[in-house]
Amino acid sequence: MKAALFLSALASTAVGVVAEELKIDVTLPVICERKTQKGDGVHMHYRGTLKDSGKQFDASYDRGTPLSFKVGAGQVIKGWDEGLLDMCIGEKRVLTIPPEFGYGQRAIGPIPAGSTLVFETELVGIDGVPKPEKIETKVVEGAESAAEAISEATEAAATASQKVAGKVAEAIVDAAKAAKTIIADTDDAPEHEEL
């Protein structure tokens, strides 16, 4: 019975991990020498909406002041800590954040429990990194227009997300096989005399 519960929980986890992942869409790719790294103090403008209704729940743009925090240090939701790494000053991204990378099953202010969040983000600055005089947007090699460049950058981000999801799924399958082996080796006999 315990084994069945364990496998059921493992399978539920596997389905949840594969079904819900952080989605990163680069809407304005930028060229720079220094991208955001874990532990950087950053200044970020954003607009947050609920995926289901499109209702805005917060926006730094409305206040006229970007949010300042250390990226990758647990000061913000996990979706931001992971989704805002490797950004250039001036770059814009849209993050689609499932509950597991947001607020989970907790209701926070106008955000209902279990909500998928969508954030339009713009990196305004990185502590200790001079702001460039001119923001140079990135044109993907072979791209004929900015729209095509954005599309190609978004596809590259999606491919990276799929690779991560594939690795997680492989790890879950391996764990399920190991659990099945352990359960198969378990019986009600008080002693094991197989050897």
From Swiss-Prot:
Activity regulation text: Inhibited by both FK506 and rapamycin.
Signal peptide, first to last residue: 1-19
Motif Prevents secretion from ER per record, residues: 192-195
Keywords, ordered alphabetically: Endoplasmic reticulum, Isomerase, Rotamase, Signal
GO CC annotation: endoplasmic reticulum
Family: Belongs to the FKBP-type PPIase family. FKBP2 subfamily.
MF annotations from Gene Ontology: peptidyl-prolyl cis-trans isomerase activity
Main location as per UniProt: endoplasmic reticulum
Stored InterPro entries: FKBP2/11, PPIase_dom_sf, PPIase_FKBP_dom
Residue ranges of the TM segments: none
Subcellular location per the Swiss-Prot or TrEMBL entry: Endoplasmic reticulum
Source domain of life: Eukaryota
Broadest EC class assigned to this enzyme: isomerase
Keyword hit for Glycosyltransferase: no
Protein name: FK506-binding protein 2
Enzyme nomenclature, EC number: 5.2.1.8
PPIase FKBP-type domain sequence ranges: 39-127
Catalytic activity: [protein]-peptidylproline (omega=180) = [protein]-peptidylproline (omega=0)
